[in-house]
Every structure is written in structure tokens, then in C-alpha cells.
Amino acid sequence: MAVKKMVEAVFVVGLVVTMMNVWGAVPVEGAISCNQVVSAMTPCATYLIGNAATPAATCCPSIRGLDSQVKATPDRQAVCNCLKTQAKSYGVKLGKAANLPGLCKVTDLNVPISPNVDCSKVH
């Protein structure tokens, strides 16, 4: 009987720990989703991964729209994590990516686009 209670207790503790890990992986409420970031960056693809010398006419307005949604550190970190993943996946030209915030005159969205950035340090 005592063994059964011990097994039940271990099971409950394990379940609680698992649920805490899952809930901890949920984005912070209000943080920008990666889908929003990718959607905003899509008009910039010919510049960031292609051979275009300048961003497309629709790139900067799209980036400024995303910039206006960035309100706090969790937003910038969410954008950073998404861009970090996308930079790895799509072979973003990092020099061009570094120039994009200045070219588009964005302020809050000024986060590095690099596969090597530590997004926890973005504030």
C-alpha cells in the first residue's frame, strides 16, 4: 500500500514538473510571434538573402510596421530569437542585415540579425 502511494506521489510530481516546463515554453503574453516577424521581413528577402543592392520598396514600410509593435524587452527578445533562427535557416547576408535598421530608420526593432546573437542580452 505504501509503495502504491509513493508511486502516485512521484507520478504527480513528475506531471507537475512536465506541465511547468511546457508552460514555461509558451511565449510571454504580448510578445510578437515569429509568424509576425517573418511576414514583416518577407518583403526584404531579395535584399537580405538575394543580390538586390537595396531593399525593395515594400521592405522598409513593412519593417517600420513591425517596429511600431515592439513595445518592451520581451518583444525585442522574441524578434531576436525569430531572426536568429531565420538567419540560420535562410543564409541571411549578415552585412546587409546589419544595415537594414539604419536603412529603414527603425528604433525599437534595432536587434541584431545573426545566428550567433545571445537574445537574452537584448533589451
Swiss-Prot record:
Give yes or no: UniProt keyword Signal.
yes
The record's section on SUPFAM superfamilies has:
Bifunctional inhibitor/lipid-transfer protein/seed storage 2S albumin (SSF47699)
Q: Can you tell which superkingdom this protein's organism belongs to? A: Eukaryota
Family matches, as PROSITE patterns? PLANT_LTP (PS00597)
| Disulfide linkage | 34-82, 44-59, 60-104, 80-119
InterPro entries per the record? Bifun_inhib/LTP/seed_sf (IPR036312), Bifunc_inhib/LTP/seed_store (IPR016140), Plant_nsLTP (IPR000528)
The cross-references to SMART domains, in alphabetical order and at most eight, read: AAI
Keywords of this protein's UniProt record, alphabetized?
A: Disulfide bond, Lipid-binding, Signal, Transport
Role of this protein = Plant non-specific lipid-transfer proteins transfer phospholipids as well as galactolipids across membranes. May play a role in wax or cutin deposition in the cell walls of expanding epidermal cells and certain secretory tissues.
Gene Ontology MF term list: lipid binding
Q: Which family does it belong to?
A: Belongs to the plant LTP family.
Protein name per the record:
Non-specific lipid-transfer protein
- Tell me yes or no: is DNA-binding among this UniProt entry's keywords: no
PANTHER family associated with the record: NON-SPECIFIC LIPID-TRANSFER PROTEIN 2-RELATED
Renumbered to this chain, the signal peptide range is 1-25
- Biological process (GO), any one: lipid transport
Report the Pfam families cross-referenced here.
Tryp_alpha_amyl (PF00234)
